[in-house]
Swiss-Prot record:
Any one biological process term the GO annotation gives: maintenance of translational fidelity
Name of the gene this protein is made from: EFT1
Localization of this protein: Cytoplasm
Residue ranges of domain tr-type G in the record: 17-346
Pfam family, one: GTP_EFTU
Pathway connected to this protein: Protein biosynthesis; polypeptide chain elongation
The protein, known as: Elongation factor 2
Known role: Catalyzes the GTP-dependent ribosomal translocation step during translation elongation. During this step, the ribosome changes from the pre-translocational (PRE) to the post-translocational (POST) state as the newly formed A-site-bound peptidyl-tRNA and P-site-bound deacylated tRNA move to the P and E sites, respectively. Catalyzes the coordinated movement of the two tRNA molecules, the mRNA and conformational changes in the ribosome.
Binding site for GTP: 26-33, 158-161, 213-215
Length: 842
């Protein structure tokens, strides 16, 4: 345990080469918070007795009750390395003390937006995988997010104690399980990794994989064992590391290494990993768990483990825990892996800068980020807001990428829509103070140089969720984060007592600040809507709203799903609309956009902010668009970045450029609220074929053009075989074989489609993957548990939009029922207007 003061930390912050910013990511319940504990205990915050139970990073009451992590929390740890270890570090270092900023993030699918916020400010990730369950859907989602942010992974295979005690596996089986898990991680890594990163696959023989048990507080890497044996046998450590993994076998008779699993006489040899690493661990486990009093002291002496006074009287699991912790302390293995293999900010920002910064790659600010320069202009990205103990105020939590942030410093606070040279979304204010985030506590400090993670007080009222702080007037923003989930489940919230309304409004503002992925808005009919990514996420948000942010009793409507409106074919005739003064006409047609193009727009591969020539090139080469069309994209909608497009296909129209702004504004409006039931449009492409305009500018202003364009868009849309799309979850369910039948019956009842079912080799568990419409997912978890006797655990994550085949204009069809219910709820006329209503005759 290190006694560790703020001053020591502050001095380490200046040696940026010795800082490591990393996050812990994993599937839900694979043991992130538990592993984090053994690290925190090493840095001197939890007592050793509590590690494994305290879950120090789960700061909220509901996190401790539910046993899940909901918000990501940050902690700074201090670690000292021996000189020979420091020599092995491939990057520049200075001295042997290291500062590790660790962020524990939630594993539950519904909170993956929290994970994104954590990943943005870190350079490395500790991926935790359960030995028995292996790589699950969420491990893959989060790992994909990390690699997309150019973050280097290292892996911990956790819960090895379960494999030994519950499943009683043999050594070779355990080795095969490990090897399979490492392989499935590497498959994901090689699929999604960025070339810039080089080879970021994980190799046990290089020490980038650790094995252990968070609950018992022990872990090891192959490097640690190689170091032990290298000293004992006087061999080279690097050679030893290679031999302790994979197909290498040691023949004790001839004292020779071979890569065949039999010796000359055909007797089977034992794999080196099993013989040198697993054997001592298995022996300890068997001796202690079978209460062999005489064998234990002999083993302990061989392994140089000394028990103190009252520890000698322990037996069974309690003794096992103490012994394993002394033999292989988890913190040593993990800290060594983090310090040796994860990049320092200096190394990482060199290759992450261009991806973090919106402006050109050669301007002063981008170069300062690349060099992680503490003397340059300040560049700080706020990735989220953390509620303080005093109600309604927030710390801004983020990372300094360049420059130094000081208490009392005046900074430019740039929101996500800021454009250099304009005044929108910009505040110039002073930071009241700079604090260090330590899990449940904060420590004030004076200033903080580039490369570190930090909390700021006093700027929360100027930022919604994220933003860039800078002192340079020419600086562009840091790029906005891409969330892999979208808010698709909504509820309407009302107050029970009308006097509390102002508190609700204030509470909704605070809620949308504190959670990066929640949407709050007011609908046409005056309801307050809260949208979240799934049932659990919404439940937590509403609980926060009721108890913390608003603090008043609320009435909550049953959840509703967000739909999208789309078209299936090209408009059957050209839609024409005249302006209110009859002097201007717009002719257009609507047609569908391919799903892959819509996805590319939603995932930011095709970006409205890109150079139009480069964008046209991509669309022509990868998606088969006509280059002239791709160059003439006027805008994306809704909100300027959605998957709907306006294409200018007119020939030689006078004054056309003058109405472009009005057309764009009208299109944003039309795509935000479609004609069928006021939901957003998706995958609709509008081709403007011809425009007739009045010669006098005064007769073709916004007031004439905007309503015309909107009517024309609606008419074209309704003529093009309109359909509605519903959101679909990908569900992954892990369960024992006898429960599979129960899962199928529940899925069939809820319009689910099973995609795959496979057994995990070496375990009795089955993994079922299925598509489940979000609309049907409410109460799914409960029904599933009932049908399978509590043996199945579903994980749901938004996967795609699926088009409903039936006709939304026919009130008797499935789609028509949904439309009718929504129109009633929104207070619109019950029948959908026909295209004639928006179409004008010549």
């Amino acid at each position: 345990m290190v006694a560790f003061t703020v001053d020591q930390m502050r001095s380490l912050m200046d040696k940026v080469t010795n800082v490591r910013n990393m996050s812990v990511i994993a599937h839900v319940d694979h043991g992130k918070s538990t592993l984090t504990d053994s690290l925190v205990q090493r840095a001197g915050i939890i007592s050793a007795a509590k590690a494994g139970e305290a879950r120090f990073t789960d700061t909220r009451k509901d996190e401790q009750e539910r046993g899940i992590t909901i918000k990501s929390t940050a902690i700074s740890l201090y670690s000292e390395m021996s000189d020979e270890d420091v020599k092995e570090i491939k990057q520049k270092t200075d001295g042997n003390s290291f500062l590790i900023n660790l962020i524990d993030s939630p594993g539950h699918v519904d909170f993956s937006s929290e994970v994104t916020a954590a990943l943005r400010v870190t350079d490395g990730a500790l991926v935790v995988v359960d030995t028995i369950e292996g790589v699950c859907v969420q491990t893959e989602t989060v790992l994909r997010q990390a690699l997309g942010e150019r973050i280097k992974p290292v892996v911990v295979i956790n819960k090895v104690d379960r494999a030994l005690l519950e499943l009683q596996v043999s050594k070779e089986d355990l080795y095969q399980t490990f090897a399979r898990t490492v392989e499935s991680v590497n498959v994901i890594v090689s699929t999604y990794a960025d070339e810039v990163l080089g080879d970021v696959q994980v190799y046990p023989a290089r020490g980038t994989v650790a094995f252990g048990s968070g609950l018992h507080g022990w872990a090891f890497t192959i490097r640690q064992f190689a170091t032990r044996y290298a000293k004992k046998f006087g061999v080279d450590k690097a050679k030893m590391m290679d031999r302790l993994w994979g197909d290498s076998f040691f023949n004790p008779k001839t004292k020779k290494w071979t890569n065949k699993d039999t010796d000359a006489e055909g007797k089977p040899l034992e794999r080196a990993f099993n013989m040198f690493i697993l054997d001592p661990i298995f022996r300890l486990f068997t001796a202690i768990m079978n209460f062999k009093k005489d064998e234990i002291p002999v083993l302990l002496e061989k392994l140089e483990i000394v028990l103190k006074g009252d520890e000698k009287d322990l037996e069974g699991k309690a003794l096992l825990k103490v012994v394993m912790r002394k033999f292989l302390p988890a913190a040593d293995a993990l800290l060594e892996m983090i310090v040796l293999h994860l990049p320092s900010p200096v190394t990482a920002q060199a290759y992450r800068a261009e991806q973090l910064y919106e402006g050109p790659a050669d301007d002063a600010n981008c170069i300062a980020i690349k060099n992680c320069d503490p003397k340059a202009d300040l560049m700080l990205y706020v990735s989220k807001m953390v509620p303080t103990s005093d109600k309604g105020r927030f710390y801004a939590f983020g990372r300094v990428f360049a420059g130094t942030v000081k208490s009392g410093q005046k900074v430019r606070i740039q929101g996500p829509n800021y454009v250099p040279g304009k005044k929108d979304d910009l505040f110039i204010k002073a930071i009241q103070r700079v604090v260090l985030m330590m899990g449940r506590f904060v420590e004030p400090i004076d200033d903080c140089p580039a490369g570190n993670i930090i909390g700021l007080v006093g700027i929360d009222q100027f930022l919604l969720k994220t933003g860039t702080l800078t002192t340079s007037e020419t600086a562009h923003n840091m790029k906005v984060m891409k969330f892999s989930v979208s808010p698709v489940v909504q509820v309407a919230v009302e107050v029970k007592n009308a006097n509390d309304l102002p508190k609700l409004v204030e509470g909704l503002k605070r809620l949308s600040k504190s959670d990066p992925c929640v949407l709050t808005y007011m609908s046409e009919s005056g309801e307050h809507i809260v949208a979240g990514t799934g049932e659990l996420h919404l439940e937590i948000c509403l609980q926060d709203l009721e108890h913390d942010h608003a603090g008043v009793p609320l009435k909550i409507s049953p959840p509703v799903v967000a739909y999208r409106e789309t078209v299936e074919s090209e408009s059957s005739q050209t839609a024409l609309s005249k302006s209110p003064n009859k002097h201007n006409r717009i002719y257009l047609k609507a047609e569908p956009i391919d799903e892959e193009v819509s996805l590319a727009i939603e995932n930011g591969i095709i970006n409205p902010r890109d150079d139009f020539k480069a964008r046209a090139r991509i669309m022509a080469d990868d998606y088969g668009w006509d280059v002239t069309d791709a160059r003439k994209i006027w805008c994306f909608g809704p909100d300027g970045n959605g998957p709907n497009l306006v294409i200018d296909q007119t020939k030689a129209v006078q004054y056309l450029h003058e109405i472009k702004d009005s057309v764009v504004a009208a299109f944003q409006w039309a795509t935000k609220e479609g004609p069928i039931f006021g939901e957003e449009m998706r995958s609709v492409r509008v081709n403007i074929l011809d425009v007739t305009l009045h010669a006098d500018a005064i007769h073709r202003g916004g007031g004439q053009i905007i309503p015309t364009m909107r009517r024309a868009t609606y008419a074209g849309f309704l003529l093009a075989d309109p359909k509605i799309q519903e959101p679909v979850f990908l569900v992954e369910i892990q369960c024992p074989e006898q429960a599979v039948g129960g899962i199928y019956s529940v899925l069939n009842k809820k319009r689910g489609q099973v995609v795959s079912e496979e057994q995990r080799p070496g375990t009795p568990l089955f993994t079922v993957k299925a598509y489940l419409p979000v609309n049907e997912s409410f109460g799914f978890t409960g029904e599933l548990r009932q049908a399978t006797g509590g043996q199945a655990f579903p994980q749901m994550v938004f996967d795609h939009w699926s088009t409903l085949g039936s006709d939304p204009l026919d009130p008797t069809s499935k789609a028509g029922e949904i439309v009718l219910a929504a129109r009633k709820r929104h207070g619109m006329k019950e029948e959908v207007p026909g295209w004639q209503e928006y179409y004008d005759k010549l």
